[in-house]
Amino acid sequence: MKNIFRKFVFTIFVCLINLQLIAASFNEKIPLYFKLTNENLLAGQNALNIDLCDSRIKEWCTKPQRELGLNGKKINDYISISPDIKGEWRFGWWYNINFTPESNFVAHQTYKITIEDYIFPNFVGLKSNNISFTTLPLLPIIKEMNYLQDNIDISKKFVQTKIAFNYPIDPKTLEERIEFIKSSTKEKLPFSIKFNTNNTEATIITNIPPLTDKEDTISVIIKDGVKPLHGGEVFTYKNVKDPNNKTPNNIRYSYKENVLIPSLSSYLKITNSTATIVKDDKLKPEQIIIITTNTPVSGEEIKKHLELFLLPQDKPAFLGVAGKKNYKWQNPKEITDDILKSSEKINFELLSSVPSITTMHSFKVDTFASRALLVKVNQGVKTSDNLTLGSDYFQIVQIPDNPKEVKLMSDGSILSLAGKRKLPVYSLGIDKLYLEIDRINQQEVNHLISQTNRYNIFQNPTFINEYTFNEYNISEVFQEEVIVNSQNLNLPHYTDLDFSKYFNLEEAGSYSKGLFLAKVYAKDNNNIISQDKRLILVTDLGCIVKTDKTGTHHIFVSYISNGKPAGGVKADIIGLNGEVLVSSKTDSKGHAVLSNINDFSKEKTPVAYILTTKDDFAFMPYSRIDRQVNYSRFDVAGAVSSDQGLKAYLFSDRGIYRPNEQGHIGIMLKQTDWQGKFDGLPLEIQVTNPRGKVIDKSKIVLDAEGFGEYLFSTLDDALTGLYNISLYLVGDKGSNNYLNSVSVRVGDFQPDRMKININFNNSQDELWTNPKDLKATVNLINLYGTPAENRKVSGFIDIRPTEFFVPRFKEYKFYSSKGNKEFFYERLGDITTDSKGTANFDLNLEKYYNATFNLTFSAEGFEPDSGRSVNASKSLIVSPLPYIIGFRSDSDLKYIKTKTSAAIEFIAISNKAEKVAAPNLTLNLKKINYVNNLVADSNGNYSYSSVPIETNISSDKINITANESYIYKVPTKEAGDYVIYLTDKEDTIFAQAEFSVIGEGNVTANLTDKANLKVKLDKDDYTAGDTILLNIITPYTGYGLITIETDKVHNFEWFKADENNSIQEIKIPDGFEGKGYVNVQFIRDIEATEIFISPFSYAVVPFTAGIYKHKQDIGLTLPAKIKSGEKLAIRYRTTNPGKIIIFAVDAGILSFAGYQTPDPLNYFINDKALEVRTSQIMDLILPERPLLMKAYMAAPAGDGCINVARNLNPFKRKSQPPIAFWSGILEADLDEREVTFDIPSYFNGTLRVIGVASSLDSIGTSKADLLVQSDLIINPNLPLFVAPNDEFTVPVTIFNNLKDSGNAQVFLNIETSEGLKILDYPKEIPIDENKEATINVKLKATDQLGSADLKVVASINHLKPDIISMAVVHSSELTSTTSVRPASPSVTTVNTGFITDNKANLKILRDVYPEFAKLQISASKSPLAIISGFKDFLDNYPYGCTEQLISQNFANILLYNEQELVQILKTDRKNMDESLSKIFQTLSERQNYDGGFRYWNNFNDDSDPFISVYAMHFLSEGATRYLAVPSDTFNQGIYYLENMANRSINSLDEAREKAYAVYILTQNSVITTSYIANILKYLDEYHKNTWQDDLTSVYLAASYKMLQMNEEAEKLLDRFTLNKPISKTDYQYYNPLIKYSQYLYLIAMHFPERLKDFDPKIVQDIALFAKDNYNSLSASYAIMASLAYADKINHVDEATIKVTSTDKEVTLKGNKVMIAELSVENKNIDLTSSSNGFFYQLLTSGYDKQLTENKEIVKGIEITKKYLDENNKEVSKVKLGDNITVEITMRSGSNKTLSNMVLIDLLPAGFELLPDNNHINILERTQEVMIWKPIYINNRDDRVMIFGTISDQKMTYQYKIKAVNKGIFSTPAIYSEAMYDPQTYYRGVIGNIIVE
């Protein structure tokens, strides 16, 4: 006790000292010293941690309580370590410094760390600014050393050793210095060794000799001399013994270890034994004893040595100890010889297993349940490699209790009324069954359906609210107890549940016929221990319902007992209240039609189909998914017609457009009967951008033929990505009916200049190709028609597994024995094309000669000296097989009845898809037997699993001839599963056919519940009125329904099939056109024995009829070749009078876009979906009781739009418009007409001309290509953009197309505009006629920003052959452009302040380019000075969430009627109107159904409360000024605010939002006193001491004021303190500038009288807060406050302010805001006022010429950007044409998540985004790095812009770029910022990358 007291006193004493020191530390310097916390871990690449400790307390490391303000900061610039090691230094969260090394420490090396003391605050004093430490020596840990043996190949025995080191080691030095020694012989054993990827862990396998009769030991020792991989002291065992070298978890460092090697009699062990209950295939429970061993042993061997004893139930008395009744035996040591003698020896049966030698052995016993068994395995058990069980094994196991179970048999719910009406009940271990039959009144079906679950009502009827409404509300209940008459309750018992006695057929008017809820359960002491229930319908009426496009219902009814159509059946649809909605009767064909009821609702909501006759009743739930037939596995997809029978087809002229381009969309509309006229039809086009926002709605008028066009326009700031142009039919009440759409892509692109083709040397029209000598030929062609010679081509092969499919023999199944199971990818290198543009690749497939695989050869062809390229790929099957063998059968091979005839046909096919001979084959027939293998699942539960074993039956030699197939007659005498193998003399398998022969009571292991129906039509195409012949192969006998369907049912036929193979027919109706579907539904015969598969099967097969009737032929006549700059004349004609559109497009654009020529005929005729929905109850039919019981005796039961305009490149190059011509709609008929287009002089290439024509009842397309060529064709490859000082090479290819010019000298003259400087180029070059040559022009980008031109003029002085000595100059010129843009994005900074005296000097710290730059000073005696810069900042704000768009426009509303200020600010009134109109429209689009507004234009986003209030504030101000605010948007917004004000409050931020909402509601004449009371109640309860100083109270005060409750308002204001600090939270809509601005605004608007005594410092503070802490919201609020305040103050003295800058002096006069525009060259600005005290605002906007010191700026976010090669290694030099990955890694610099972040990454010049993956993050997630998932990505040709949320964990984003030009290029500085926190941003550094 004394010691405890002393410790307590000492602790109190130290704490008091500590508290004194803490208190003193706020007034004096805190002396700190450095303490290394993890010195015993410093090795390898482990992190280093340093604590900063208060040196005044020596006993332990005490950390001061005063914040350093350095948490999370990266401090590499302030710390040095010697010797140097790269890594990241960072402050931790509390007086802690962490170092994460990028490379390994040196072993046993002393390091010195020096920390600059000026990084610390002034209150810190360092005892020393350095600390030293020594890393650990190289030390090993032998983690594992175990004897192991392979349980599959038991001869393999080995020792596995795992050794870890604390540093990466030199692998070779360990191999030389490690030994494994066998103790008995002292011999050194050989070993193999593998290292992990960083060489810190070795896994060593030591094979050992065969075991002997004696145990042995193997030792491992690591000798001195193992070397660390990265330098330092080598390993010595003395360091292991050093007690100072300890691991943190007390893991022992070690250099030697040993392991015991067992003897022959010590290794084999019985590891476990247990008893369990497992059901056999007859559902009979079996008692199983399971014995497991540690190594495989034969079950027979265990059986020989196994004894099982049933121990006595009672423990006998022994040596005076009393016995015990019902004793639970547990310990084998309790079993004496006497007890063993009194035990009963139990017989057992070994269960077969696969394989027979295994570690788990199962024995079946039959003994008493709940009794104990002694398991004894006598010593002497031997394995095949002589391992022996050295001692007896004893274990007591408990036999489990017998299971108790009850269930209704089979699946299904319908019993035939004409049958036995009985359903067996399966029971086990049950002596009494409790039955409950709830007979449901027919009139209550509506309640049954509406009150139960919507899925699977028959099999699992569950009432939704069973405590208030259940089966007893709608039924009559019958209960019965049934005694189970069974001699052995442990065997399955079957009790019939007879439904006949529960209904009376004689009661003609009875409404309680055949619908029951059957329940069966078992009890134990009145507790239900097992139960089952099922809805049972006893009926003879089966139905199929087909609902067509119009909602019409076709009811097909048949008798279940005989399959005949049921005539005279009343068919109704009933509603929710039970009343009949529509009714009809079936005709003699069992068919009835019920009309459309889609518009029925409320009490008439349809719930069921009801079928009734005099004495029968059936029903089916209406529109339930479990009753609908799923056709997804059939080819039923296609276009869907509108409700009005209209189909529309839209096509674009080229599929891809750059921003700010226009495109043409063609529209074609037809009625399904081709009869309609369409002039005057109300149609609308809607254009949706990639974010899902509708950006255009336009009314469209078509001509009578249904032909029209739409002009698609894009803006310069258009989002890149996929746009949908949709056509709608406008309804009567403004509702739109969708017809169709076309998608086009908007993005920067370069048209292809070449075409690439691939061919293989020996694969013409072949199914497969032999791999020997296989070659691929790549042909490159310039799109102006000449071979592309001397071009680099890269080749790649991709090899994957495949299967054969032969279209000509699609009914046959083919098998490939040469199975390649792996994937391979190989780069074949580069080849240069020859004079024909050809490159030949030898594929070198020798290593794959013995495999069959799918080969894809890919080629990439490059433009000369450029990285731009075209790609192509081609696939084929490669195999060495001489032929393949396929088989088919007219029988269903899964279900062949015994003693029936069935055959399998085999054919041999060559690679030409022709039948060939296949001699000398062997046909092996094998039977598949199934062994019930006992297996354990993951939970330890045991069950039988059927394992197939093949047994040889017969082997026959066969031949397949070329003319005849081989017909194999299937042996069907004996039931079972069989497999046929066809092999050649090398035992290569050519075919494998499996079949099952089904006999009575035989159900094989592979039966499924799916019934496959095979249907084949006699042909694919028909004429209307033809009869279709169907070959139907059914899984059982029965009857069926055949229908012809499209969007309606055209015809139907019932049929009956007494055999599994039958021919049926159905007629195509007269007048049928286009694509249709033959739908076959088949129902199992009531007497059929195939009861373990579904009684309902179906199949759908498409066909066509009359498809050429509506084809329109088009004749296009045009020249094959034309010169650039000439006029192209196209002559056209059509076979039928109508209209035509002709368009011509650069084939390079179409190639890049992957454009498909319009094919409207195929769409209107063939592209038609199956639109009839089918529902049925046939799959619920239960098998008859005798069939069911017969089978069960033998087998088991079958149970926000982001506007990034200002982030675009404003220095865009002036690109040439794309080559695309559009004629518009022209008249066309048999007379030939002409249309002309002007070909630009700069275009050379292929022009594709396409014509699309339409008449009332015909349509057609046609296309033709022509070449456009100049005498000299010039193709430069200029980068799309460059940065100042980039030096690069531009390849210019010139093709000599001048006839008779020979080997001509081509003279070159190259000029550039100011943005480019020529460094070098050749002035002339010889070029042969019809040849090309490439020159390289060396250029440098200058500081002149904007579009820069490169003009190339090539000329030939050509001597005319017919005029001697007369030379004619032939020349061509081409001007190409690039963008010279800075290597950093545009940044706007605003410097705001208040000057107390009359002078100020402002420094301009930025050096910006003059282009798009702005330097503006505004000044005033009033705070109006701040509105100019902030308005400019908002007008050019680069992002566009809902808040930012509102903030951009709030000033426009507030200034709308302020004419003087509008003029001073030079605001354009027209622009104001356009901007306001746009924001009103945007707010309407971003409004949710609840009336609130989304943050972005993402349709799934919830309404944002603050944004919604802010939006309504904006709209309210607009409505006050009588602007065109959408009334429905406004009214819905008010509704949202009312609901919002009623919600519960969970925080002060939420209270402020609700107070703001109440303020807006009050402003709009809503009585809000109750809302205010609720808010005040919450505030007083949860924020009693803080809320009075929050902006919340000012909003409430203003609301009180508007409610004329002045006293309450004044009280709130009097208690409010403005300058109370704001608590730091993650809430982003509240900061000091917002608080001060809104306070001033509310006071000025509602309490102007308080302005008389207003502290002017409040207004001045707004300017000071705005100095460096503004965002879009706070800037908007600051403008709002300034305007309101200026409007209310009585008088502002006129002032004169002189502005003196470098270039000029300006004198400003006025009493409002005064503005001066200055040159961006200024570095200093002096302001001199005529009186003291004025506000100013300095705005600087533009692109920085050089980043300050080119150092990264890290403000709360850290970003790393790397360029990685294909091996993920960082590179600064790449080769032309390389694809590289840009990897951006980022994380928050604090412990909080940063939301609303934007990241802008400019591409280096000479690179282009890869089109395939530039829109997604290509990374896969790893454990180390989180993959960033941005909210939105916008890609342009020179930049990637990404928006999202960044956490405090490392997050990585990747995209790929391609090097396309040689040169030295600037790598731009990456930039990121938080859109709501100006203090959080990042700017990287500018570097260089070389492309060579």
From Swiss-Prot:
The keyword Signal applies. Residues 1-23 form the signal peptide. The keyword Transmembrane does not apply. It comes from the Bacteria. There is a cross-link at residues 1441-1444 (Isoglutamyl cysteine thioester (Cys-Gln)). It holds the Pfam family bMG10. GO terms for molecular function: endopeptidase inhibitor activity. InterPro entries: A2M_N_BRD, Alpha_2_Macroglob_MG3, Bact_A2M_MG5, Bact_A2M_MG6, Bact_MG10, Macroglobln_a2, MG2, Terpenoid_cyclase/PrenylTrfase. Keywords: Protease inhibitor, Signal, Thioester bond. Gene3D superfamilies: 1.50.10.20, 2.60.40.1930. Belongs to the protease inhibitor I39 (alpha-2-macroglobulin) family. Bacterial alpha-2-macroglobulin subfamily. Protects the bacterial cell from host peptidases. This is Alpha-2-macroglobulin.
